[in-house]
Amino acid sequence: MSDIVASFSSISAVNIRPHFTDSAWSEYQKIVAEGNPTLARTPSWTFAELDSLVICREMPIKLNFKGNKKFVEDVVFRVNKKTKKIESLAYKLSQNTEKHIMAKEWNERDRLTLITFLEDYRTAYCLRDIEYINKVFSNDAYIIVGKVLQQSKKKYNDNTELINQDGKVVYTQYSKEEYLVNLKKSFMSKEFVNIRFEECNVGKGYNAKEGIYAVQVRQLYYSNNYSDDGILTLAIDMRNDVNPLVRVRVWQQERDVEYTAEQMIERTVSTEGSISSN
């Protein structure tokens, strides 16, 4: 990892490309292309094993955008034990979210697998990676999008009329195709997207629903032209954990007892993985 750290902290003549698989190098290029990153501080590494990987946490980088907008992201590297190559990388979850998941009385593999998925999910939105989002949402995903209307003004002659009620939330259900079309348009209008997960509540299915996870987090969304603060609930089918699928994605401004993590498993995802509209 020292070569990679050096590439951020100074002008390094070391070729770091051999440390990455092709797919991981592509992910790395997306990260270094975002916000002119520099090393925020000397990394303090911790390590965990997940199947064939060693998870290396974390390298803090500072991102700088127009308007003096700055963020620090901790980058997680997942290294193959045998080849010693980095197979994937992502932005780390918040300490509170990670701590909550690790406190669950599940086996360590389940906890680390869920954390890894959420890191990838969050990173995809931060990097505006439509390809990943398309891959990870099931074709029949149940998607509810909430948008906080911002106050806007439009002039008619010399009069100014308020068009939208500031703070009003509009909820819309979309198909996967509709959601991705709108999301792509939204991403194209943004210089950056910064998403944080807090106040995490997670649950997992058992017996016939083993491998189904539900996650409810407070999502703090901030970009150069839009921001909101709400509750994101996901139902994730990880029965094939190599190719996990988001089967439910619901955003609400306030926490709703209809969409707790546990109830999401029981009420929305059937044992066959199909979606119920009830």
Predicted regions and their residues:
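A compositionally biased, intrinsically disordered/low-complexity signal enriched
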Residues: M1, F8, I16, F20, ...
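Loop/turn elements at helix/coil->beta-strand transitions in domains of secreted/extracellular proteins
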Residues: R128-E131, V193, V242-N243
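Short beta-strand edge/turn micro-motifs at domain boundaries
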Residues: K66-D110, Y206-A214, Y222-N278
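Surface-exposed, charged secondary-structure patches
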Residues: A24-K81, N157-D228
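Short, well-ordered alpha-helical segments enriched in acidic and aromatic residues
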Residues: M1-V32, R128-Y156
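Short, low-complexity N-terminal intrinsically disordered segments enriched in polar/charged residues
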Residues: M1-S10, T83-L127, K135
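A mature extracytoplasmic/lumenal domain signature
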Residues: I61, A90-L93, F137-D140, K147-V148, ...
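Conserved small-residue-rich
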Residues: D110-T172
